[in-house]
Each structure stands twice: as structure tokens, then as C-alpha cells.
Design a protein with these regions (language model features):
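Alpha-helical transmembrane segments in inner-membrane proteins
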Residues: 1-349
Length: 349
């Protein structure tokens, strides 16, 4: 009887925990929807909630100007904020899980710096016959995948630990930042300014075509990652414990890195460098949802989506009418959070 009571208590606690987790996930989903509407409302020509809702759902009569503002200008940017936020959050979440390092993210592994270098080459030296709006994303994507290839090379080595992979990522970060600085130094002032603006990260480049590309790539990569959820959850117990459960760490490491690199490269190539999403969102999701990847992964996506969407709203109201880069807003929020992580780790030690 006593053992049955213990089992019943465990089951009840587990159900209570799952209800709490679903509540958190649904809460961030609601925040994302609200922030989407706010993002579409906000701009030089402020729209009311009713105007946005009527335009989005085709309710009543909507004048052509409002319809054009919503569908051709603001909605692609607002949806891009949600999708890119979710994409970068997944990348950061799985990199942190894989490397068991709270400071790890696609940004700190040098992928963002590589994208910046690739974009700067195209901006400074020409688009090689392609339209600039096509060539810049291609340059950023190619260079990000090159940096990822270097990480894959080291990750494929049997005795190469997660800590050493982080060090390789930091080395790549400094290498590509140095190359980027060199390109800016030898470029004309107006070209250097264009590079700098791209590096700030901006959702103003959003189009329906680029949005669809990111959605397709992210959906495929997340679907493939979802097949490895139990392995990634087990990995949080430690590499030795995961290996004892029959998990091939080398294969898992390469697979996760490939998928994260694809998502990150695609997102960054279209919107520029937007830092700290991949660092902040996973930590918030982990604090509220725990390490179970069934809840942690969708939770991180929703936190990242809401974070970037709200940052997009803030970027429009800081200087009304000005194109304030959203990457600056995320950095202002992310830097204090980064210090908080460092102090927390220090106390834990």
C-alpha cells in the first residue's frame, strides 16, 4: 500500500509539473501573438488594434493604404522577427546542450562573425554580377557554412572534447572579426558604413520570399532535431552517462552542429547579426521549463520569438520614424543578462 502511495505521489507531481510547463509554453505563445500585433501596429503611421485585426483577418472594409502597410511593409517584418527569434533560440539551446556550456551560442562560436565577413566582402568588392540583395545573403551564408565546416572537422575527431570545440569557436570568432575589421579598414567610408549597418542587424530587409526560405529551413531542421530529443536530454546528465546509454556522441555532435549551422546561416544571411537571442532565450526556457527537451525546445523557440518581436517594437518607438537597428536593442537587453549568467556561475562554483 505504501509503495502504491509513493507511485501515486510521483505520478501526481509529474502531472503537476507538466501542467506548469504547458502553462509557461502557452503564456509565451500568447506573448508572441500580442507582440506580433503590436509590431504591425507600430511605425511612422500608427495603426489601431482594430485596423490591424481587420486587415489581418479580412473583417469589414479596410482601405487600400492600411492594407498595403500591413501586408507589404509591416507583416513580413513582424513575422520575420518571430521566425528569426525562434531560429536563433533553437540554435543557442542545442549548442548549449551539446557543449554543456551556458555561454555557448552560434554567436560565440564565430558563426555570426563569419556571416559578417562574408557579407562585407560582397558589399565592399561587388556582387559578382548578382543583385546586391541576393549576393549579400549568399556571401553571408557561404562564409557561415565555411566556419561551420571547420567546427565539423574538429567535432569529427574522436578525442576532441566539448571544451576544446568551444575554444575553436572562440578562435574562429576572433579570426573572422579581424578579417571583417580589415575589410572595413580598406573600404571607402560610405562602404564601411553600409557594412556597419548590416552588422547591426535589421528586420527592414524582410521580404515574403526570404521569410518563406527561413521558415522552410527552420522547419526541416527542427523536425530532424526532434528525433534526437531523448539523446539531447540524456546528454545533460553528462557525456559519460550518455555514452553508457548507447548514444554515439560523435555522430550526435556532428548532426546537431550541421542542423544548427544551417538554421543560423540562413537566418543571419537575411537579417544580419542579431546577438544574444541564442544566449538569453535558452536560459529563460531552461529556468522555467527544465532540461526535458520535449518542453525545452518549443519553449526556447517561443521565448526567442517573443524576445525578438518585442525588441522589434522597442526599436520602432526609441526614435519614432527612424530605422533603429533591432540588433542594438537585443544587445542592450542581452549584455546585462550575460553578466548575470557569469555572476550566477561564479556563485555556483
Amino acid at each position: 500500500m505504501k509503495s502504491n502511495s509513493v507511485v501515486a505521489d510521483i505520478v501526481a507531481n509529474q502531472r503537476k509539473l507538466e501542467r506548469k510547463r504547458w502553462f509557461v509554453i502557452l503564456s509565451f505563445l500568447a506573448i508572441g501573438v500580442v507582440s506580433l500585433i503590436l509590431d504591425v501596429m507600430t511605425g511612422p503611421a500608427m495603426l489601431s488594434v482594430s485596423e490591424v485585426v481587420n486587415a489581418l483577418f479580412g473583417i469589414g472594409e479596410v482601405d487600400k493604404m492600411t492594407d498595403n502597410i500591413v501586408y507589404n511593409l509591416r507583416l513580413p517584418m513582424a513575422l520575420m522577427a518571430l521566425v528569426v527569434g525562434a531560429t536563433l533560440a533553437v540554435g543557442g539551446a542545442e549548442i548549449q546542450t551539446l557543449l554543456n556550456n551556458p555561454m555557448a551560442s552560434p554567436y560565440t562560436l564565430g558563426l555570426a562573425a563569419a556571416a559578417g565577413f562574408g557579407a562585407s566582402i560582397v558589399i565592399a568588392f561587388g556582387s559578382f554580377g548578382l543583385p546586391v540583395q541576393v549576393a549579400v545573403p549568399i556571401g553571408a551564408f557561404v562564409m557561415t557554412m565555411l566556419a561551420s565546416g571547420i567546427l565539423f572537422l574538429f567535432a569529427s575527431k574522436r578525442r576532441f572534447s566539448s571544451e576544446m570545440l568551444v575554444l575553436v569557436g572562440i578562435a574562429l570568432l576572433f579570426i573572422f572579426q579581424s578579417l571583417l575589421s580589415l575589410v572595413q579598414f580598406i573600404s571607402a567610408p560610405e562602404v564601411s558604413q553600409q557594412i556597419l549597418f548590416w552588422l547591426f542587424g535589421s528586420l527592414n530587409k524582410a521580404t515574403w520570399q526570404s521569410l518563406i526560405i527561413i521558415i522552410v529551413v527552420t522547419t526541416i531542421c527542427v523536425a530532424l532535431l526532434s528525433k534526437e530529443l531523448w539523446k539531447l536530454t540524456a546528454l545533460r546528465l553528462g557525456e559519460d552517462r550518455a555514452a553508457s546509454l548507447g548514444i554515439n556522441l560523435q555522430v550526435l555532435r556532428i548532426k546537431v552542429l550541421v542542423l544548427v549551422a544551417m538554421m543560423t546561416a540562413t537566418a543571419i544571411s537575411f537579417v544580419g547579426v542579431i546577438g544574444f537571442i541564442g544566449l538569453v532565450a535558452p536560459h529563460v526556457a531552461r529556468m522555467l521549463l527544465g532540461e526535458d527537451q520535449r518542453f525545452f525546445l518549443p519553449g526556447a523557440m517561443l521565448v526567442g520569438a517573443a524576445f525578438l518581436s518585442l525588441s522589434s517594437v522597442l526599436s520602432k518607438v526609441i526614435i519614432p520614424g527612424a530605422l533603429f537597428p533591432v540588433g542594438i536593442v537585443t544587445s542592450f537587453i542581452g549584455v546585462p543578462f550575460f553578466f548575470w549568467i557569469i555572476l550566477n556561475n561564479k556563485r555556483g562554483q
